[in-house]
UniProtKB/Swiss-Prot annotation:
This is Zinc finger protein 185. It comes from Mus musculus. Expressed in skin, kidney, ovary, testis. Also expressed in brain, cartilage, heart, lung, spleen and thymus. It is found in: Cytoplasm, Cytoskeleton; Cell junction, Focal adhesion. InterPro entries: Cell_Prolif/Cornif_Regul, Znf_LIM. GO terms for cellular component: cytoplasm; cytoskeleton; focal adhesion. Residues 61-72, 251-268 have a biased composition (Polar residues). Residues 292-347 form the LIM zinc-binding domain. GO terms for molecular function: metal ion binding. Residues 272-287 have a biased composition (Basic and acidic residues). It comes from the Eukaryota.
Length: 352
């Protein structure tokens, strides 16, 4: 209520009273004064009510909408990021200065640029296609021709069996230095070289990439003995099998690597050798399962006790102390092993 509104009501607030001694008696208002008083009060309410109502609504909106605004703020930021990523392919066509951002750029923008440049490997693989080579400029044609060289060197290292990531990374670095870095396609080729060095760490992904580029060449390099009728899926499986079990077959049999790549049957034989469980072996190395060590009878479905490091596999009722021959099948928590010999509690105490 402002001062002007109060002045309008002031004449009606003064009540007429007759002072008789110390007591004051209130005189009731006349109907005319009561009507004027009510009209003035209604006029003031009409002026102040919308303003006070809007103030209350604004305060209520602040209290109720503040938590929702805090929840919606990261959602708005995510939408802005999606819009920026749609524009980023145009930024990739700029010189490779984006790979070295200025100090003024924030960390979030640098992460977006780096992520966008590395993520699409499929777009870079399409550069090798002859259709795009015909549409590109002569400079880009030279750089696109350099890309298959990088990809073709990867199966060469795998064919020799060396697969040294440091040597391959040095070769890729030499090729990337020869390429011009000023053109936009040069930046993509540099990123492509980095992707190839990263793929060398995982042989399976490297194999799949080479298969996409040139399947016939891969079958000639890595699996020379396989016929041309074998489909691409079986070729990939054969390559992975040879790569995985090559070292184990060389150590166990001492045969050269080429002997294991002669035919698919030799690959399956090497797989069967590698898939054998480790506990299987010759009778001299490990005890024959199914025959009791003490009574030399078959164990079959009876409860058995097996101690592999001692060469014991026996019935539960045949298990006994190695000194006093006391049955120890029900006393497994009281056995002691000293110098590869089973002792009961009493025999073990006699040692000290």
């Amino acid at each position: 209520m402002t001062t002007e509104d109060y002045k309008k009501l002031a004449p009606y607030n003064i009540r007429r009273s007759s002072i008789s001694g110390t007591e004051e008696e209130e005189v009731p208002f006349t109907p005319d004064e009561q009507k004027r008083r009510s009209q003035a009060a209604l006029g003031v309410l009409r002026k102040t009510a919308p303003r006070e109502h809007s103030y209350v609504l604004s305060a209520a909106k602040k209290t109720t909408s503040s938590p929702t605004q805090e929840l919606q703020s990261p959602f708005l930021a995510k939408r802005v990021d999606v819009v920026d990523e749609d524009v980023l392919p145009e930024k990739n066509q700029e010189p490779p200065a984006l790979a070295r951002p200025d100090s003024g750029l924030s960390s979030s923008t640098t992460e977006k640029i780096a992520h966008r440049q590395i993520t699409p490997p499929t777009a870079e693989l399409h550069l090798v296609a002859p259709d795009l080579e015909a549409l590109s400029t002569p400079d880009s044609c030279e750089e696109n021709n350099a890309a298959p060289k990088i990809i073709k060197e990867i199966p060469g290292t795998l064919q020799d069996g060396q697969s040294d990531p440091t040597v391959a990374s040095q070769q890729l670095a030499d090729l990337s230095i020869l390429e011009p870095l000023g053109s936009p396609s040069g930046a993509e080729q540099q990123i492509k070289a980095e992707d190839c060095t990263n793929m060398l760490m995982s042989p399976s992904s490297c194999m799949v990439t080479v298969t996409v580029s040139d399947t016939s060449e891969q079958s000639q390099l890595c699996v020379p003995g396989v016929s041309s009728k074998v489909d691409s899926s079986s070729t990939i499986k054969g390559i992975l099998f040879v790569k995985e079990y090559m070292n184990t077959s060389e150590v166990s049999s001492g045969k050269p690597v080429s002997s294991h790549c002669d035919s698919p049957s030799s690959i399956e034989d090497s797989l069967d050798l590698a898939k054998k469980p480790p506990h299987e072996g010759t009778p001299s190395e490990r005890p024959t399962e199914g025959v009791c060590t003490y009574c030399s009878h078959e164990i079959q479905d009876c409860p058995k006790i097996t101690l592999e490091h001692l060469g014991i596999c026996c019935h539960e009722y045949c298990f006994k102390c190695g000194i006093c021959n006391k049955p120890m099948g029900d006393l497994l928590d009281q056995i002691f092993i000293h110098r590869d010999t089973i002792h009961c509690g009493k025999c073990y105490e006699k040692l000290f």
